Amino acid sequence: MIVAEEHKIAPWKIEEVNNLKKLLKEGQVIALVDMMEVPAVQLQEIRDNIRDLMTLRMSRNTLIKRAIEELAEESNDPKFAKLAECLERGAAIVITDMNPFKLYKTLEDGKAPAPIKAGAIAPSDIVVEAGSTGMPPGPFLGELKGAGLPAVIDKGKIAIKDDTVIVKEGEVVSPKVAVVLSALGIKPTKVGLDLLAAYEDGIVYTSDVLKIDEEEFVQNIQSAFTSAFNLSVNAAIPTTETIETILQKAFTEAKAVSIESAFITDKTVDDILGKAYAQMLSVASEAGEEALDDDLKERVSSTASAVEAKEEEAPKEEKEEEKEEEEEAPAAGLGMLF
């Protein structure tokens, strides 16, 4: 608390710092936002929209810095003091129960389209689409051409002939271009509260850490889960998610070993006998007929006939399919006429 040299420090500043410290103690998540570029009208709309989600408190940067540093010293939390290092431009304090990542997304989603000012850096390629501007011929035609747009007169109105990138990403917007974009109603930028940093549980999160690609993040989580799942199954480390697959894999492998080694169980006896029978017929078919009795000859003959019938049936089916395709072709041709 500020108690010394009160004659040199305005009383309202002392009171403001104390009020800020009291506010900072209330939040689970404490964040700093930059609101320098937000017009008064949009700022009021933002405050109305976030009123139920967070508390926004504006003050001077010097007083916010003093409040953070004093509170960090009083609570013996040097990590909290690092939050003050993120202060810049027109900062304000945000107090909320939302985690920093959700807070960042909420503030980004709350930004509104706005005209871009001269001297600003284009956040992405600024494109003016082809089409009528709805404006009658006049001096504005020259302004459009002066800004580099292919402007023409079409049906008594000024029109843009082709889609045109008027400013590339990273380039500075010139005064001429800024005027033209504003007149055309193009709003290539967004205004809102820019999150500078957020503090939670001893960690200061800067905006670059909080800015994540949600789709990529979900894909990474899914990929990690798949890798962990496969590792658990292949290493036979049972978990709630993998126990069923591990048991199925173990059963399949055990059954294969049992069949291959002719180890009879109630689960493999049919497969083993079937395999032995097939092997017996294979050996019998390789032996001469004089080595077989009548029963075995009949079995070998039946198997051979079944194989031949299957081989003859396959080409027949292929011919029928080809015939159907030939019959469908003229019909399809007629269909093209209607």
From Swiss-Prot:
Biased composition (Acidic residues): 319-329
UniProt entry tagged with the keyword Cell wall biogenesis/degradation: no
GO BP term, example: ribosomal large subunit assembly
An annotated Gene Ontology molecular function: large ribosomal subunit rRNA binding
Superkingdom in the source lineage: Archaea
UniProt-listed SUPFAM superfamilies: Ribosomal protein L10-like
Disordered: region residues: 292-338
Cellular component terms per the entry's GO annotation: cytosolic large ribosomal subunit
Annotated S-S bridges: none
Annotated family: Belongs to the universal ribosomal protein uL10 family.
UniProt subunit comment: Part of the 50S ribosomal subunit. Forms part of the ribosomal stalk which helps the ribosome interact with GTP-bound translation factors. Forms a heptameric L10(L12)2(L12)2(L12)2 complex, where L10 forms an elongated spine to which the L12 dimers bind in a sequential fashion.
Identification of the protein by name: Large ribosomal subunit protein uL10
Organism: Methanococcus aeolicus (strain ATCC BAA-1280 / DSM 17508 / OCM 812 / Nankai-3)
Gene from which the chain derives: rpl10
